[in-house]
């Protein structure tokens, strides 16, 4: 579960390392976001000479959460960190690589490009 002020790691090769959630998209009263939801982030740490700079505001999709997610078959899946992938205006990933595993729930959220870039789908 991600809410405003939550820090996330950026799991792509755009150059951003750490991000902070500043808005959960999907309604004015919406408080929490889960895997596959789109949020607005601000980049807090970035490597030099990268496509995103510190202070950039952009949209991102959540690919991993430390809070467990219940699946239809009764199993739970959780990860070690909260992570996101930066999106462009067309809601496709801005980077060309995705680091670490991603959850299978991204397929249901129609983020097939992110799933295809990931090395492992759990």
UniProtKB/Swiss-Prot annotation:
It holds the Pfam family Ribosomal_L14. GO terms for molecular function: large ribosomal subunit rRNA binding; structural constituent of ribosome. Keywords: Ribonucleoprotein, Ribosomal protein, RNA-binding, rRNA-binding. GO terms for biological process: translation. One of its GO terms (cellular component) is cytosolic large ribosomal subunit. Part of the 50S ribosomal subunit. Forms a cluster with proteins L3 and L19. In the 70S ribosome, L14 and L19 interact and together make contacts with the 16S rRNA in bridges B5 and B8. Binds to 23S rRNA. Forms part of two intersubunit bridges in the 70S ribosome. HAMAP family: Ribosomal_uL14. Belongs to the universal ribosomal protein uL14 family. This is Large ribosomal subunit protein uL14.
